[in-house]
């Protein structure tokens, strides 16, 4: 049976876009490194075409027997398609038993039909890294060595002692100290010599937490509770007695009582109601003779 029946026609549309995207991720440099690594371990030549040299599965099964002897008991050297697919299936099963992660594996058709050579390359690189992790020495430095599990067992006493240790997530106390600090609860006098504030001599000293008294003074202030006369010399307010009006009540500079009489009767005279005419004796009429409003 010819292998042409497994070949597919050209891809179009979305299938072609997906195929081109997968091919763009294929690394020719990694292919050359894999070629050197496989040929160095197996002693077999892959040939100019990497996919055609590995599609029969013979070289790959030989590689697994070098990494893990007896992992592939039987290698089919027939050119029949199902024999080649069987070799690829046995190689994939051997990788699983070798400890490969299932997400790093490829399918047989990915290599046989060249459907996804990028995944084939990823699987072989992961296999090289797994072999390096297990201590395989090779002339070609390829693959990433996986970190090994580091497990520690602690007794109960050690676990309880670790509960008193401050974790690094909480910060560090390397640069912290209590130098210069007084004991907790001790009385402290707060002052600052840089601001020329003298050390406190008594309990009436204002601490720095309340501000500073450097520029404050009581010059010109009388003792609390002392009677004070409020006046202003600029406004002409006299300070002779207690009848002086404070500035809060206004000022009397422009006010006076000239022409006012307190306690005496006042004659109300309105020229509109008192006609100016000669009396019988030739004298003006008296103010009391003026008729009131509404009188004739």
From Swiss-Prot:
Calponin-like repeat spans: 166-191, 206-231, 245-269
Sequence ranges assigned to domain Calponin-homology (CH) in this UniProt record: 28-132
GO BP annotations listed: actin crosslink formation; actomyosin structure organization
Role: Thin filament-associated protein that is implicated in the regulation and modulation of smooth muscle contraction. It is capable of binding to actin, calmodulin and tropomyosin. The interaction of calponin with actin inhibits the actomyosin Mg-ATPase activity.
A single MF term (Gene Ontology): calmodulin binding
Phosphoserine modification, residue list: 138
Family label: Belongs to the calponin family.
Residues with N6-acetyllysine modification: 8, 25
Gene: CNN2
UniProt tissue specificity: Smooth muscle, and tissues containing significant amounts of smooth muscle.
Name under which the protein is recorded: Calponin-2
Organism: Sus scrofa (Pig)
Phosphoprotein among keywords: yes
Modified residues (N-acetylserine): 2
Keyword terms of this UniProt record: Acetylation, Actin-binding, Calmodulin-binding, Phosphoprotein, Repeat
Annotated region described as Disordered, given as residue ranges: 275-296
CDD domains: CH_CNN2
TM region positions: none
């Amino acid at each position: 049976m010819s292998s042409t029946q497994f070949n597919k026609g050209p891809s179009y549309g979305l299938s072609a876009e997906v195929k081109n995207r997968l091919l763009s991720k294929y690394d020719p440099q990694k292919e050359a490194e894999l070629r050197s690594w496989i040929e160095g371990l197996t002693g077999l030549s892959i040939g100019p075409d990497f996919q055609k040299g590995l599609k029969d599965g013979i070289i790959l099964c030989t590689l697994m027997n070098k990494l893990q002897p007896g992992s592939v008991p039987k290698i089919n050297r027939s050119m029949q398609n199902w024999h080649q697919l069987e070799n690829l299936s046995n190689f994939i099963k051997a990788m699983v038993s070798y400890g490969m992660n299932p997400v790093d594996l490829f399918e047989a058709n990915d290599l046989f039909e060249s459907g996804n050579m990028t995944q084939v390359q990823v699987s072989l690189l992961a296999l090289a890294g797994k072999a390096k992790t297990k201590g395989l020495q090779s002339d070609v430095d390829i693959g990433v060595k996986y970190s090994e599990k580091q497990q520690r067992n602690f007794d109960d006493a050690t676990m309880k002692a670790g509960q008193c240790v401050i974790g690094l997530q909480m910060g560090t106390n390397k640069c912290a100290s209590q130098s210069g600090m007084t004991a907790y609860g001790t009385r402290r006098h707060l002052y600052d010599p840089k601001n020329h504030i003298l050390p406190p001599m008594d309990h009436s000293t204002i601490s720095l937490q309340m501000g500073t008294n450097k520029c404050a003074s009581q010059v010109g202030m009388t003792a609390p509770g002392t009677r004070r006369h409020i006046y202003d010399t600029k406004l002409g307010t006299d300070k002779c007695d207690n009848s002086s009006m404070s500035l809060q009540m206004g000022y009397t500079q422009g006010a006076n009582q000239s022409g006012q009489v307190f306690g005496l009767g006042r004659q109300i005279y309105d020229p509109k109601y008192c006609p100016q005419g000669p009396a019988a004796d030739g004298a003006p009429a008296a103010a009391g003779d003026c008729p009131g409003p509404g009188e004739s």
